Curated annotation (Swiss-Prot):
The gene is LEF-11. Pfam families: Baculo_LEF-11. It comes from Orgyia pseudotsugata multicapsid polyhedrosis virus (OpMNPV). The keyword GTP-binding does not apply. One of its GO terms (biological process) is regulation of DNA-templated transcription. The keyword Cell membrane does not apply. InterPro entries: Baculo_LEF-11. Involved in late/very late gene activation. Keywords: Transcription, Transcription regulation. Belongs to the baculoviridae LEF-11 family. This is Late expression factor 11.
Length: 125
């Protein structure tokens, strides 16, 4: 077995699992009556208190799923950091990751007329 799989330090923690970790951290903070900025969204500046709580308690968190039985979150600190502090907006991050995988995007970006009108664009028949 490769050494990275043995020490459970591979980046197998998904974005959904990090978001679930976020939700559990918010619930724990609420349960302990530490409610400062717990309603802030992950991408807002006010979310720093929840992010600090997660960073401070990484060694206590575990994720249990079928793909990895002993995933302590502290081994995935790079993945957690990338998710909590994105360097770009999610649309551009997705475009970059899909382009890296497929070498060219498999979808078309919505034209500017769509963003102004807030209605889906349709192709003429």
């Amino acid at each position: 077995m490769p050494w990275r799989a043995q020490d459970h330090s591979v980046d197998c923690l998904t974005r959904s699992e990090v978001y679930a970790l976020w939700a559990e951290a918010v619930n724990t903070l609420k349960r302990n009556l530490q409610v400062k900025n717990v309603s802030a969204h992950l991408l807002e500046d006010d979310a720093a208190d929840v992010k600090d709580y997660i960073r401070a308690n990484l060694s206590r968190f575990t994720v249990i799923t079928g793909k990895c039985s002993r995933r302590t979150v502290c081994h995935h600190h790079r993945r957690v950091q990338r998710t909590l502090e994105p360097r770009q907006d999610l649309v551009n991050e997705y475009a970059c990751s899909v382009t890296d995988v497929y070498r060219s995007p498999k979808w078309s970006i919505c034209p500017t007329t769509c963003t102004r009108s807030r209605s889906p664009t349709t192709t003429p028949r």
